[in-house]
């Protein structure tokens, strides 16, 4: 697997998504949570989830080739 392969990108996106999950959870528990920051992070997480879904579908299509 090279540094620019779709599989590598998938791993990177999953890692970034997991990091965002942890950050969002930690910030949400804070008593003085910055709501604007939380919304931005959640929006970024959703965008990552969409990218992950598209890439997973491209790498593993349901229909046989």
Where are the language model's segments positioned?
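Extended, charge-rich alpha-helical interface modules
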Residues: 1-65
């Amino acid at each position: 697997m090279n540094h620019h392969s779709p599989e590598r990108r998938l791993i990177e996106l999953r890692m970034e998504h997991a990091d965002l999950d942890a950050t969002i959870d930690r910030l949400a528990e804070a008593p003085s949570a910055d709501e604007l920051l939380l919304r931005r992070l959640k929006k970024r997480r959703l965008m990552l989830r969409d990218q992950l879904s598209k890439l997973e579908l491209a790498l593993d299509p349901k229909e046989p080739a």
